[in-house]
């Protein structure tokens, strides 16, 4: 990988943020406040082992406190303030999820909703098989980060390393949010790269796979059946 430092361009180009193509949207409920302290979240953060199917409320709490938009810059609408930090306030990573109840979707931070994505079935199968190698028989949500290379390149020369650093910050933030809400979260060591980058049909930007993770309830269907 090229490890040269990124250089901010003296004058950004004309590129405007592009959204992923969606077939339909499902609104999420309003996020609720976490009941634990920041210290407690830090102390309880561990890589998850069991992943039950997350509820809409759990998804809302997690996604709303990771990617929700707080503010959009008036002079440059590519720059946004969200819960998580990002290079130059660009937030180039799109957070995709595979949910058993919906299939592949993307979190839409402006409307706090999930957008159903058109995907290539063979690519989907390969990505899910890759995740199953890490966590066989899980019931959780697969998280995939697809970063917009063109957006970052509009502002920085040699922007590729920045995309991975940015995704790392997002994943670390997500791990703490999951801990605060009592959810299981595990960052996976692989991203699926070319397979993940070809997952979505009709994508309008250069997509770079920058992260793969699992999110779920700590109560699996197996444990629920014993109650």
Model-derived features: positions:
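N-terminal accessory segments that position/regulate proteins before the catalytic core
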Residues: 1-167, 181-227
């Amino acid at each position: 990988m090229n490890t040269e430092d990124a250089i901010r361009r003296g004058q950004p180009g004309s590129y405007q943020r592009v959204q992923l193509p969606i077939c339909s949207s499902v609104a999420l409920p309003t996020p609720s406040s976490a009941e634990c302290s920041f210290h407690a979240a830090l102390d309880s953060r561990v890589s998850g082992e069991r992943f039950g199917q997350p509820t809409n409320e759990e998804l809302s709490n997690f996604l709303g406190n990771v990617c929700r938009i707080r503010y959009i810059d008036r002079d440059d609408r590519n720059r946004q303030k969200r819960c998580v930090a990002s290079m130059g306030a660009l937030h180039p990573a799109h957070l995709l999820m595979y949910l058993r109840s919906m299939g592949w979707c993307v979190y839409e931070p402006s409307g706090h909703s999930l957008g159903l994505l058109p995907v290539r079935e063979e690519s989907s199968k390969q990505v899910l098989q890759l995740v199953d190698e890490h966590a066989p028989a899980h019931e959780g949500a697969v998280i995939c980060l697809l970063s917009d290379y063109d957006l970052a390149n509009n502002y920085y020369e040699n922007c590729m390393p920045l995309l991975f650093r940015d995704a790392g910050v997002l994943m670390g933030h997500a791990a703490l949010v999951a801990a605060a809400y009592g959810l299981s979260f595990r960052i996976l060591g692989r991203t699926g790269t070319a397979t993940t980058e070809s997952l979505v049909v009709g994508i309008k930007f250069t997509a770079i796979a920058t992260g793969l993770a699992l999110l779920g309830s700590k109560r699996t269907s197996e444990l629920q059946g014993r109650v």
